[in-house]
């Protein structure tokens, strides 16, 4: 699956149309609260401008329902922040394929950067529209995909644009190359023991991942609220815990398939008031023994200890989804114990994006793991064994 990278093509005086992921959080005053995604795109952008090329950046931000002009979904703050990080002027177009974008794209000089307005302001983006894609494609001499977070999607900028640029160089950026290498290596040639840790709320979100990983991993450790659906499937009492009753039969099938590989919590940290975790009645009970007026909120200390032992012996670890309500202490203890065990070990550790990436960051372990993925949905899709059309059609290395 190795693809040609941005560093491997000639960009001198050429225009590169680069799909990035600038889907950054903004506060009420439209200030960026976390610019990590912009910073992660810098190596690919610099690869072009430092070699005398021109860059046109395209991205989505949020899920706008109206047309252009809804400033809370505008990429203007991202363009401004990028200029600060690069220490140079970054041009911004108020549309994607309109007059402003066209005139600014055609007047770009070598070493300059243009950010187009939010792709999703145009309905053609989500529809994968070829006419919209053709207008974007016409602006450039080469295409670069550096948006791993949307690699599993078939949006116009991900698939129809590179299709429209057949015959021109179509490559991956640094970020996508790194993501694919880590995740592909983990799945296809892991150093063993290979352990997967899966948390989060819903079994339904992770069915295909659990299924695929049970065939590849030496152990699959389950935490988060989805553990309560497994508990219910084993005949346990789950109280008021979040469960998917329509997925109980499926949980039984996964337990039968997984056997000893599929490890479930042995105890649970529960409480009686989700809205006031600090002040709720908290107690640790055996798994499957949650009182009727309580709900499970985290794995218990025995489970944390048991999982830490498995993690310490691992050589490859994939973690997707927290063990409990990590954003509400003390229900962060299970997630913290897992993060600590990963940080203390010497395994190749890959943290799936989304909540697990936020947890690792919040708990201060981001520098102690091998790789924190930038794409929650995309990393899950790769762990399911899905092929990505957006990557498959790019040039082979």
Swiss-Prot record:
Reaction equations catalysed: (2R)-3-phosphoglycerate + ATP = (2R)-3-phospho-glyceroyl phosphate + ADP
Against Pfam families, the record matches this protein to:
PGK
**EC nos:** 2.7.2.3
Keyword terms, alphabetized: ATP-binding, Cytoplasm, Glycolysis, Kinase, Nucleotide-binding, Transferase
Query: Which residues make up the binding site for substrate?
Result: 21-23, 37, 60-63, 120, 153
* Gene Ontology, cellular component aspect: cytosol
List the Gene Ontology MF annotations in alphabetical order.
Answer: ADP binding; ATP binding; phosphoglycerate kinase activity
Localization in the cell: Cytoplasm
Tell me the residue numbers annotated for binding ATP.
206, 296, 327, 353-356
Q: Name one GO biological process term.
A: gluconeogenesis
State the InterPro entries in the record.
Phosphoglycerate_kinase, Phosphoglycerate_kinase_CS, Phosphoglycerate_kinase_N, Phosphoglycerate_kinase_sf
Pathway involvement of the protein, from the record? Carbohydrate degradation; glycolysis; pyruvate from D-glyceraldehyde 3-phosphate: step 2/5
Q: Is the keyword Acyltransferase assigned to this protein?
A: no
Record note on quaternary structure: Monomer.
Q: Which PANTHER family match?
A: PHOSPHOGLYCERATE KINASE (PTHR11406), PHOSPHOGLYCERATE KINASE 1, CHLOROPLASTIC-RELATED (PTHR11406:SF23)
State the family it belongs to. Answer: Belongs to the phosphoglycerate kinase family.
Family annotation (HAMAP family)? Phosphoglyc_kinase (MF_00145)
| Protein name (Swiss-Prot/TrEMBL) | Phosphoglycerate kinase
Q: Which organism is it from?
A: Rhodopirellula baltica (strain DSM 10527 / NCIMB 13988 / SH1)
């Amino acid at each position: 699956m190795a693809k040609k990278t941005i560093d491997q093509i000639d960009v001198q005086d050429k225009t590169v149309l680069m799909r990035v992921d600038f889907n950054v959080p903004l506060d009420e005053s439209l200030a960026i609260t976390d610019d990590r995604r912009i910073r992660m795109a810098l190596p690919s952008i610099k690869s072009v401008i430092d070699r005398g090329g021109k860059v046109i950046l395209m991205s989505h931000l949020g899920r706008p329902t109206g047309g252009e002009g809804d400033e809370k979904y505008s990429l203007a703050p991202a363009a401004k922040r990028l200029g600060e990080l690069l220490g140079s002027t970054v041009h911004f177009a108020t549309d994607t394929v309109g007059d402003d974008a066209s005139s600014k794209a055609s007047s770009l000089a070598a070493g300059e950067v243009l950010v187009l307005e939010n792709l999703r302001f145009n309905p053609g983006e989500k529809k994968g529209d070829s006419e919209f894609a053709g207008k974007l494609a016409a602006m450039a001499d080469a295409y670069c995909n550096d948006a791993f977070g949307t690699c599993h999607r078939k949006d116009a900028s991900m698939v129809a644009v590179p299709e429209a640029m057949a015959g021109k160089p179509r490559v991956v950026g640094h970020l996508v190359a790194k993501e694919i290498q880590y995740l592909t290596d983990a799945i296809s040639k892991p150093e063993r023991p290979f352990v997967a840790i899966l948390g989060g709320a819903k079994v339904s979100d992770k069915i295909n991942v659990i299924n695929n990983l049970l065939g590849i991993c030496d152990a699959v450790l389950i935490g988060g609220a989805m553990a309560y659906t497994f508990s219910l499937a084993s005949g346990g009492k789950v109280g008021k815990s979040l469960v998917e009753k329509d997925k109980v039969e499926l949980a039984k099938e996964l337990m039968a398939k997984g056997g000893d590989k599929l490890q479930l919590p042995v105890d649970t940290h529960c409480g009686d008031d989700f809205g006031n975790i600090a002040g709720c009645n908290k107690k640790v009970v055996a798994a499957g023994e949650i009182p009727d007026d309580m709900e499970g909120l985290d794995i218990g200390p025995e489970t944390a200890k048991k999982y830490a032992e498995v993690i310490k012996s691992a050589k490859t670890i994939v973690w997707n989804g927290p063990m409990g309500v990590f954003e509400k202490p003390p229900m962060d203890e299970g997630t913290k114990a897992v993060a600590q065990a990963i940080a203390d070990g010497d395994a190749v550790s890959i943290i799936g994006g989304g909540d697990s990436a936020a947890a690792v960051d919040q708990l201060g372990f981001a520098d102690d793991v091998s790789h924190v993925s930038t794409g929650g949905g995309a990393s899950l899709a790769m762990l399911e064994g899905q092929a990505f059309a957006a990557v498959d059609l790019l040039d082979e290395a």
